[in-house]
Regions:
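Buried, small/hydrophobic-residue-enriched core segments of structured protein domains
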Residues: 4, 91-95, 102-173
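Flexible, solvent-exposed loop/hinge segments and secondary-structure transition points
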Residues: 2-109, 117, 121
Length: 173
């Protein structure tokens, strides 16, 4: 399947996986950045290694990692792999700019092609939670109608500002 925006529509067709756990393993190539697909090919040919991802935002957010962690655990289970996940903040906690929210350790072959979807799941939920709270705190006596797609808009854009650092390690966290 080619890696383009039109292929994202295919994710919604004929999928038995729950909506919140999409994309499923067979759909990942259509939503994964080409860089990560090529990296997986290279690692596959030269040998796997243990990596640790430290995921953080370049702006303040609220920790809203549960959907991303649920998705990651389901994908890892489907692939019959193992990862070590270390959360740095409780769900709903304030997270400062640059503070690691989560560390994920495991096989690079297992994790590398999950990065695009994982970062989108983390970025969207954490920014949306922060923006929603900011609106409520700013306008305490106002009722709100949820326009979910708009919560991530603003100065930083929908997913801009999410960064992931990957360390090559020999030990788990």
């Amino acid at each position: 399947m080619s890696n383009n925006k039109n292929s994202n529509i295919e994710i919604l067709k004929n999928d038995s996986w729950p909506l919140e756990l999409r994309p499923n393993p067979s759909q990942l190539p259509s939503v994964t950045d080409t860089y990560f697909l090529k990296t997986k090919e290279i690692v596959s040919s030269y040998g796997d290694t243990e990596v640790t991802y430290a995921i953080f935002m370049r702006r303040p957010v609220i920790s809203a990692l549960n959907p991303a962690i649920d998705w990651l655990e389901e994908i890892v289970k489907e692939r019959k792999g193992n990862v070590n996940i270390k959360r740095c903040f409780k769900e709903g906690s304030d997270v400062g700019a640059g503070e690691p929210m989560i560390y994920i350790s495991g096989s690079m072959l297992l994790l590398v092609d999950l990065e695009t979807a994982l970062l989108q799941k983390i970025g969207a939920t954490c920014v949306a939670a922060y923006n929603a709270r900011s609106m409520v705190e700013s306008l305490r006596k106002t009722s709100f109608l949820a326009m979910d797609a708009r919560h991530c808009a603003g100065r930083y854009g929908r997913f801009n500002g999410l960064w992931c650092v990957c360390w090559f390690t020999k030990s788990k966290i």
